[in-house]
């Protein structure tokens, strides 16, 4: 793959993570650059790892992986989205302080859910005999940058109440998961 194709692929793979990061940033109380970079690093490492895993699995069991990857992504994102939406809907009218950071587990689960499509790309690249390491590295770096920017953009958009942001963020995650599932089931671009 040439550099332009690699960068375009990396941008495409980071789009879901960017959208999730905006909602994560909006839920935080004035996230600082360090929190944005921490979130970006978590997403970037996971997003870079999944095409490597996909490429490895593609060498061994492509049919099985591609048959289930979209269901895994949908399940993770739907679970997280429903959890966020429920949390936003069940508030009891009390003003809730926004937290200063998200837990590692929550960020890693969200990153994993948004990176399952990168695993599929890894499977596909295994059949094309493409060196996966530079591609995975580019995906990780671009995702780290996009997610860090997304968290900071979420800070700007985060003036809405925490509950509204949780509901919107949850619906975004459910939407991303549903779109991944739809694309795989119906072959939409």
Swiss-Prot record:
Keyword terms: Cell inner membrane, Cell membrane, Ion transport, Manganese, Membrane, Transmembrane, Transmembrane helix, Transport
Localization per Swiss-Prot or TrEMBL: Cell inner membrane
Annotated membrane topology: Multi-pass membrane protein
InterPro entries noted in UniProt: Mntp/YtaF, Put_MntP
GO MF term list: manganese ion transmembrane transporter activity
Transmembrane residue ranges: 3-23, 41-61, 62-82, 103-123, 132-152, 167-187
Broad class of the protein's primary localization: membrane
One matching Pfam family: Mntp
Cellular component, GO, one term: plasma membrane
Family under the similarity heading: Belongs to the MntP (TC 9.B.29) family.
Role summary: Probably functions as a manganese efflux pump.
Protein name as annotated: Putative manganese efflux pump MntP
Species assigned in the record: Methylobacillus flagellatus (strain ATCC 51484 / DSM 6875 / VKM B-1610 / KT)
Species lineage: Bacteria, Pseudomonadati, Pseudomonadota, Betaproteobacteria, Nitrosomonadales
């Amino acid at each position: 793959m040439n550099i332009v194709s690699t960068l375009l692929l990396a941008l495409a793979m980071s789009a879901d993570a960017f959208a999730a990061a905006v909602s994560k940033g909006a839920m935080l109380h004035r996230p600082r650059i360090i929190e944005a970079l921490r979130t970006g690093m978590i997403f970037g490492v996971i997003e870079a790892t999944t095409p490597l895993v996909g490429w490895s699995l593609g060498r061994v069991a492509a049919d099985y992986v591609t048959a289930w990857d979209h269901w895994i992504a949908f399940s993770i994102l739907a679970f997280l989205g429903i959890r966020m939406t429920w949390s936003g809907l069940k508030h009891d009218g009390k003003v809730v302080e926004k937290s200063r950071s998200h837990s590692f587990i929550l960020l890693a689960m969200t990153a994993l859910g948004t990176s399952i499509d990168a695993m599929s790309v890894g499977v596909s690249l295994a059949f094309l005999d493409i060196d996966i390491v530079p591609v995975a590295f580019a995906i990780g770096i671009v995702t780290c940058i996009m997610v860090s920017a997304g968290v900071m953009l979420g800070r700007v958009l985060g003036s809405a109440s925490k509950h509204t942001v949780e509901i919107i963020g949850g619906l975004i995650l459910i939407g991303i998961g549903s779109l991944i599932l739809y694309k795989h089931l119906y072959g939409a671009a």
